[in-house]
């Protein structure tokens, strides 16, 4: 069988570069086009020396006529750019947007947090997302929507960690929808590759941690609430039933997200033992190969998931505070962005879901 040809726009950025790294080793894809903006005409040997297979490729302009003609098109572009370009792309190609333009279902949420043109919602690329329950009580998941789709919206990295941490408790009614709190320690690659005082100057970043987009302003908040609503078996229009205090904190590491998500226990949760609550998380992720519920007493650490598409998870209870604490550690560029996108792409094309991916991290 011939390999699928792939074009990647935004190829010299962090997200695009991680997509290239994964796809270059994938048995079913052939990277035949890399596109950019300020780097047009430059060799990939300059920008991605860690991917020698791409050394002979030259960055082309990010234009429909360049991207069309490929089986798969990956868009790793700033929000607003993908939406404008997408309508000009081949409807028969599978297009994956790693940006925000096609994630949100409700225009009101987009207008509040992003502004500008609102674009059509695409098939959401988080296979493990719980979307409700079937008649037999088993979970329905977003995975079922992916086979055959031609348009995939890649989730946000902070969204991924927060959702995977808490969704079992939401789906089983163990946590209250109000007063959910998420504190995330985030690696600097999550802030993008543009040179900023707080993100790429070593003298500003080393030995320092910095909160950002605080006070309910972070653009990932509406997407998280949308996912919480779906996990509860509700529509995106009902996401306002949930409230979230969300604080991301940049930490001096290149990759990784450690999410600590807490919520008030419901009366149902208070009747359960700690072992029974843990069993809910175990059941929710049974058969989900990239989801790793760590042994009791072992907490997730970002150092264990670097380079992998896995999420390391844990759940504990604080009976005195009346709260459940759920933890998730992911690689923001892999599981949080490109790895999850390739996983969804595999499903869309009928390939093995884990093709080209690993849940083995690099440690130390």
UniProtKB/Swiss-Prot annotation:
GO terms for biological process: L-arginine biosynthetic process. The active site is at residue 157. Pathway: Amino-acid biosynthesis; L-arginine biosynthesis; N(2)-acetyl-L-ornithine from L-glutamate: step 3/4. It catalyses: N-acetyl-L-glutamate 5-semialdehyde + phosphate + NADP(+) = N-acetyl-L-glutamyl 5-phosphate + NADPH + H(+). It is found in: Cytoplasm. One of its GO terms (molecular function) is NAD binding. Its EC number is 1.2.1.38. Keywords: Amino-acid biosynthesis, Arginine biosynthesis, Cytoplasm, NADP, Oxidoreductase. SUPFAM superfamilies: Glyceraldehyde-3-phosphate dehydrogenase-like, C-terminal domain (SSF55347), NAD(P)-binding Rossmann-fold domains (SSF51735). Pfam families: Semialdhyde_dh, Semialdhyde_dhC_1. PROSITE patterns: ARGC. SMART domains: Semialdhyde_dh. Catalyzes the NADPH-dependent reduction of N-acetyl-5-glutamyl phosphate to yield N-acetyl-L-glutamate 5-semialdehyde. Belongs to the NAGSA dehydrogenase family. Type 1 subfamily. This is N-acetyl-gamma-glutamyl-phosphate reductase. It comes from Bifidobacterium longum (strain NCC 2705). The lineage of its organism: Bacteria, Bacillati, Actinomycetota, Actinomycetes, Bifidobacteriales.
């Amino acid at each position: 069988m011939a390999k699928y040809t792939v074009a990647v726009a935004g190829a010299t950025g962090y997200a695009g570069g991680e997509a290239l790294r994964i796809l270059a080793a994938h048995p079913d894809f052939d990277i035949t086009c890399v596109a950019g903006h300020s780097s047009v005409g430059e060799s990939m040997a300059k920008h991605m020396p860690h991917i020698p297979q791409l050394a002979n490729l030259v960055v082309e302009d990010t234009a429909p006529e360049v991207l069309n003609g490929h089986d798969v098109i990956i868009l790793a572009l700033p929000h607003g750019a993908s939406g404008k370009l997408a309508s000009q792309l081949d409807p028969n190609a599978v297009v994956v947007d790693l940006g925000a333009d096609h994630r949100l279902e409700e225009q009101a949420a987009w207008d509040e947090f992003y502004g500008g043109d609102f674009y059509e919602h695409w098939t959401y690329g988080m296979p493990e997302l719980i979307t409700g329950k079937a008649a037999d009580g088993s979970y329905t998941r977003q995975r079922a929507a992916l086979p055959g789709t031609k348009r995939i919206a890649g989730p946000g990295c902070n969204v991924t960690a927060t959702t995977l941490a808490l969704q079992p408790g939401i789906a089983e009614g163990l946590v209250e929808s109000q007063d959910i709190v998420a504190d995330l320690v985030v690696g600097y690659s999550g802030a993008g590759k543009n040179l900023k005082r707080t993100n790429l100057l070593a003298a500003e970043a080393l030995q320092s941690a910095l909160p950002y987009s605080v006070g309910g302003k972070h653009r990932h908040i509406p997407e998280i609430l949308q996912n919480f609503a779906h996990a509860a078996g509700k529509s995106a229009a009902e996401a306002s039933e949930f409230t979230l205090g969300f604080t991301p904190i940049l930490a001096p590491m290149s990759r990784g997200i450690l999410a600590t998500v807490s919520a008030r226990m419901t009366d149902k949760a208070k009747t359960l033992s700690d072992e029974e609550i843990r069993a809910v998380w175990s059941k929710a992720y049974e058969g989900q190969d990239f989801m790793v519920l760590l042994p009791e007493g072992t907490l997730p650490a970002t150092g264990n998931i670097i380079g992998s598409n896995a999420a390391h998870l844990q759940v504990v209870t604080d009976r005195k505070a009346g709260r459940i604490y759920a933890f998730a550690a992911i690689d923001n560029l892999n599981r949080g962005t490109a790895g999850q996108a390739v996983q969804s792409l595999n499903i869309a094309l009928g390939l093995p879901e884990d093709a080209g991916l690993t849940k083995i991290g690099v440690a130390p």
